[in-house]
Amino acid sequence: AWASAEPGLHFIDRSNKMSNSWYFARLQATNPCGEQPLEAYGVCTLGALNLAKFVDEDRDILWNKLRYVIRTAVRLLDNVIDANEYHFPEIDDNHRGNRRIGLGVMGLAEMLVRMGLKYGDEEAVVFTGALFETLAEEAYLASVDLAKEKGAFPRFDAEKYLQSGFMRGMSNEVRAAVH
């Protein structure tokens, strides 16, 4: 296994400290690829954005389009939770109770090339940080909008939710919207 970089290491205690669900669902393991730590009977509806699609011919980022697609993707992934048929009642109860979704990305390297940036250079690193901050903030604001429309997920407790390691790192705008 060491010759192919597998198995990877995952520090589940760190995941639990960062997890927004720390107060109602202790994470126990990850899915096979490792991108999603989950609790017992946990599932997560996953989706991905192709970042290369958000650069125009002038090497500019289509920020408004990106924000729109992020918000649409969050709504779509949330709707999938209700459309799913779950084979085990524990999974059904769990997923509908916490409404966990995961919106990831692909195409970062291609996006950087289209922008004329070299992966790993300082400018690319700074841009990538701003990009992922935008992704996270827009996704959380879209989730807040859904909560206003449909109601918060059943296990939501704003005070506890905002105590997670991840939410402590979010902007004041997002934290205020969640509260």
What do the PLM-derived regions correspond to, one by one?
Residues 101-104, 137:
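Short acidic alpha-helix initiation/capping motifs at coil-to-helix transition points
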